[in-house]
A protein has these predicted regions:
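Conserved acetyl-CoA-binding loop-helix of GNAT-fold acetyltransferases
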Residues: 84, 90-103, 126-130
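Conserved active-site alpha-helix within GNAT-family acetyltransferase domains
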Residues: 95, 119-137, 143
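Conserved GNAT acetyl-CoA-binding A-motif
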Residues: 105-116
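Terminal substrate-recognition subdomain of acyl/acetyltransferases
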Residues: 144-149
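Acetyl-CoA-dependent GNAT
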Residues: 3, 7-80, 85, 98-99, ...
Length: 149
């Protein structure tokens, strides 16, 4: 396996949706999940601050992470929908996608990065803790986690 990181394009939307569904099925232990609605991913391809980082192996997207820049009272970057296809898990791809996002956050001079993780997703929770993220808020079935960059 010789995978690389890249930036998703609009033509990648179907594959990203497949990975999103796979992620939801893993978290919720059911096949009864819905993917993105038509147009949900368009904002990531319009040249603004939102984009999707992907891992690619032999021309196929095997993982993705959505990156959203927020310019409210306090600027922060929100990471959303980290998904690594099953046969590529536990080899460092999720870590590299997050580290790539963290490098981007530093480049744009924003100092807070956050995301939600389902409490039932213990593997992801351990990964985020190992990367220095801390629980910012307990929100019932999930945590809001944050890291100062």
């Amino acid at each position: 396996m010789s995978w690389t990181l890249g930036k998703a394009e609009k033509k990648d939307s179907n594959r990203i949706n497949e990975l999103f569904i796979e992620m939801l099925q893993t978290i919720y232990h059911t096949d009864q999940v819905d993917g993105y609605s038509d147009g949900d991913l368009d904002r990531f391809f319009d040249g603004r601050d939102e984009w999707i980082s992907v891992a690619i192996d032999e021309g196929k997207i095997i993982a993705f992470l959505s990156i959203e820049v927020h310019h409210e009272d306090e600027e922060y970057v929100y990471l959303d929908d980290l998904s690594v296809t099953k046969q590529y898990r536990n080899i460092g791809i999720g870590t590299k996608l997050i580290q790539n996002a963290e490098a981007y956050v530093k480049d744009i001079d924003i100092h807070e990065i956050c995301f939600h993780v389902e409490k039932s997703n213990t593997a992801a929770f351990r990964l985020y803790q190992r990367l220095g993220y801390e629980i910012y808020e307990d929100q019932g079935s999930r945590y809001l986690m944050m890291k100062h960059i």
